[in-house]
């Protein structure tokens, strides 16, 4: 996969990233970047923080150079609608305008859903904290290197408010 250029959108504000770094040794975007580089060492990866206007302006001026965009998970709640959250949603809208291929994970999916005109509602019973059971990898997924030597049916932690 030579010449693959991916943009990762960090889903956390600085304060939340610092907590994540303290716990894991890297930000959410850096963890994802490290995983992608392990799977495909030749991929070019850039990280953008939607709350940093200078970064956003620079990235949008070169958005057509990216093969795809990955929106990470994060600790914010989209329905809080802070200025920072609005910047994330606006950035997703800009990516849509350029017809970029997008992978949105957790928080990123909520941001992209709102940017596309959807609705994200708070959980009716509060936070969901538990285990997603019997997650099954489909035939295409079974061929992906990420699932090499892994079970194709598994349980995983699940946590979200919205």
Model-inferred region functions:
Residues 48-51, 123, 159:
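Conserved beta-strand termini and adjacent loop/short-helix elements that scaffold enzyme active sites
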Residues 44-46, 119, 155:
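Conserved beta-strand segments of alpha/beta enzyme cores
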Residues 1-90, 94, 98:
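N-terminal beta1-alpha1 cap of cysteine-dependent amidohydrolase-like domains
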Residues 125-162:
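An acidic, glycine-rich "communication" segment
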Residues 39-41, 114, 150:
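Short, structurally constrained coil/turn elements
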Residues 75-140:
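Cysteine-nucleophile active-site neighborhood
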Residues 54-57, 119-121, 141-145:
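A short, acidic/glycine-rich surface segment
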